[in-house]
């Protein structure tokens, strides 16, 4: 069976996250409802991962089984149709038709998240939806020093919130970069997979280092505890974005130059 694979971006401000919720509006629900308007029934849509409430996406990937309907025969017509039906805060960036061996979640070999901090107590109007003001002087050199202890393969249990069933809490971080733009600071986190609220908890630990709560090397102690209660508080959700999802050949339709597929496969 052919899979319709979509690359999408969304502003998560008005949504309770990706996954359908009983009493709140979700990204998944809006997309599935749009599909139902055309085919007359619900078509389940599966994403690469469940983003939380208010979390954004620049490069989320999702898939659904191709319906037996004339408007779903070509990728270009699917993209045009969905964008006409979806609200302005959800945009289909690209569509491809893949085989049934592809799975947006289980075929992924890496993801990149970005978290944006602002130094301005009064950010520009639109920035308040995408950046967090931590109310202290950001010491990016200390944050980068602390980030180095998280690189590589570790048990990230101390950085994983409860609420998910994990077969393992071991993950690999390929990159954790603190990019200082002056007015804003972007934390770029790239790894082979992420636990529930893992990125926000990592950002929380780096902010604690920045404000002087503990030295950079204390990150090692947090890792060794393997206990969420010993970890830092999570940073707010609204400044986090899922930026890229990487897939191996032949499923690297949406991969950017940042996705070095061969090296990621070797590291995984």
Curated annotation (Swiss-Prot):
Classification via SUPFAM superfamilies: Pseudouridine synthase
Active-site residues, Swiss-Prot/TrEMBL: 52
MF GO annotations: RNA binding; tRNA pseudouridine(38-40) synthase activity
Function: Formation of pseudouridine at positions 38, 39 and 40 in the anticodon stem and loop of transfer RNAs.
Subunit structure: Homodimer.
Family: Belongs to the tRNA pseudouridine synthase TruA family.
The name this protein goes by in its record: tRNA pseudouridine synthase A
Primary gene name: truA
